[in-house]
């Protein structure tokens, strides 16, 4: 049994610091690096890319709606052409920086509101899928486990991996509990680490309503910007190793 660990990185902007990239990168196998639309500036993004290359971490484009003010967490009703152009712009920008650093973008993981919207909105999902195929049809798409997007993207010919979240509560339908609700984000490192192992071994988690909910987890997202994130990430990795679950990139395994 194996699993990939990913995290959202490169999100600092000028003097504003977000996350703990230098501490999280040695833990993960895949880095979802901001492309400047929800967070990140060119210098900071390039530094994160270079550190990822140095550590042998796979690079992915963390594409977003154009929403710096809202950190990409606000829904946007963009036209198909605009969304395609936005996604193409972001992938190509990050891929250019990765090329300079001696690597390349190997997957795409949408961010925030875009991630949540295309999980079920087939129109916007089609625009994102088409943009990825236009740029490089070999890129892997990271999608919410159990969402409509998984099958929609596969039907369109993309490679897809299903993502689960280590520190997020789930509804009984497999969707994430809204961050606005109490209990949406989990903070107990030992509990979360045990939950991740259980998710992988049993193929699901207990929902916020106490119902077993099937979750396929090809990759697990570790948040680097929450309280206790470093402790939690280390605990998860240690628990995986303890249970003989191999940690390796999903690229070429999708």
Curated annotation (Swiss-Prot):
It comes from the Bacteria. Belongs to the LamB/PxpA family. The keyword Nucleotide-binding applies. This is 5-oxoprolinase subunit A. It comes from Acinetobacter baumannii (strain AYE). CDD domains: LamB_YcsF_like (cd10787). One of its GO terms (molecular function) is 5-oxoprolinase (ATP-hydrolyzing) activity. SUPFAM superfamilies: Glycoside hydrolase/deacetylase. One of its GO terms (biological process) is carbohydrate metabolic process. Forms a complex composed of PxpA, PxpB and PxpC. It catalyses: 5-oxo-L-proline + ATP + 2 H2O = L-glutamate + ADP + phosphate + H(+). Keywords: ATP-binding, Hydrolase, Nucleotide-binding. Signal peptide: none annotated. HAMAP family: PxpA. Catalyzes the cleavage of 5-oxoproline to form L-glutamate coupled to the hydrolysis of ATP to ADP and inorganic phosphate. InterPro entries: Glyco_hydro/deAcase_b/a-brl (IPR011330), LamB/YcsF/PxpA-like (IPR005501). Its EC number is 3.5.2.9.
């Amino acid at each position: 049994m194996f699993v990939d660990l990913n995290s959202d990185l490169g999100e600092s902007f000028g003097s504003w610091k977000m996350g703990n990239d230098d501490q999280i990168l040695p833990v993960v196998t895949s880095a979802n690096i901001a492309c400047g639309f929800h967070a990140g500036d060119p210098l900071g993004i390039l530094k994160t890319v270079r550190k990822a290359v140095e550590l042998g971490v796979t690079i992915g484009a963390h594409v977003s709606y154009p929403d710096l003010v809202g950190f990409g967490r606000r829904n946007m009703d963009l036209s198909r052409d605009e969304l395609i152009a936005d996604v193409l712009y972001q992938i190509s920008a990050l891929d250019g920086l990765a090329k300079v650093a001696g690597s390349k973008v190997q997957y795409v993981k949408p961010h925030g509101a875009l991630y949540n919207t295309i999980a079920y909105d087939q129109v916007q999902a089609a625009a994102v899928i088409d943009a990825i195929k236009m740029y490089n049809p070999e890129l892997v798409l990271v999608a919410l486990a159990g969402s409509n997007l998984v099958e929609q993207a596969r039907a369109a010919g993309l490679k897809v991996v299903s993502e689960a979240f280590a520190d997020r509560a789930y509804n009984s339908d497999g969707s994430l509990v809204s961050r606005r609700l109490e209990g949406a984000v989990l903070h107990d490192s030992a509990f979360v680490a045990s939950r991740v192992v259980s998710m992988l071994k049993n193929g699901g988690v207990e929902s916020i309503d106490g119902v077993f909910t099937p979750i396929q987890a090809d990759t697990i997202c570790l948040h680097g910007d929450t309280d206790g994130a470093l402790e939690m990430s280390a605990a998860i990795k240690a628990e995986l190793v303890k249970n003989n679950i191999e940690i390796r990139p999903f690229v070429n395994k999708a």
